[in-house]
Regions:
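Bacterial N-terminal signal peptides that target proteins for export
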Residues: 1-9
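Beta-strand-rich domain onsets/edges
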Residues: 23-59, 63-65, 152-160
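Short flexible loop/turn segments that cap and initiate beta-strands
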Residues: 52, 65-93
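Aromatic sugar-binding surface patches on proteins
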Residues: 99-112, 118, 122
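Internal, hydrophobic beta-strand segments that form the core of beta-sheet-rich folds
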Residues: 114-142
Length: 160
């Protein structure tokens, strides 16, 4: 008769630990990202592009979803950062776009290419950090036509 209470106790103990272990498993994230020309560039703003001149603004638009497809905002993630192959990091912010009359709420960040930045193709990645500290990384396909490309020339905005 002593086996019954021992088995019951072991079963209850096991059931109590199982949910704890499941709670520690991180949820996979899905990242979708693109690059567009920032406002005031050599072409229309917010249009997909991967070729930019120096002094132009590169803008990244990013969506992060959990395993159920739910969009994650600043309350659902610790951070979203674009990391360049040269080590530069650009933290993204969550907000409405376009700013004056939002039609989408996304993560975004931008970078004005320095006048002395080298030309060529450069890899980058997007790193999303979940609230539990786990990270998910997205990178574009590693072929020159899809990478950030700095072309010869320097953009000079028109005088106002």
């Amino acid at each position: 008769m002593k086996i019954g209470p021992v088995v019951s106790l072991a079963l209850l103990f096991g059931l109590g630990i199982t949910p704890l272990a499941q709670a520690q498993v991180s949820t996979p994230l899905f990242i979708a990202a693109d690059m567009v020309r920032g406002p005031g560039g050599s072409g229309p703003g917010c249009v997909l592009s991967n070729q930019f001149m120096r002094k132009e603004e590169v803008a990244w638009r990013i969506r992060v979803q959990d395993a159920t497809g739910k969009e994650l905002d600043e309350k659902g993630l610790k951070s979203v950062v674009v990391e360049m192959s040269d080590g530069q990091k650009f933290p993204a912010r969550f907000g409405g776009h376009p700013p004056k009359a939002p039609t989408a709420y996304i993560w975004s960040t931008a970078w004005v290419i320095p006048a002395d930045y080298p030309t060529g193709s450069f890899n980058y990645k997007v790193v999303a950090t979940a609230l539990d500290g786990t990270t998910t990384t997205w990178e574009p396909i590693n072929t020159k036509p899809t990478l950030l490309t700095i072309v010869a020339g320097t953009f000079e905005p028109p005088a106002k």
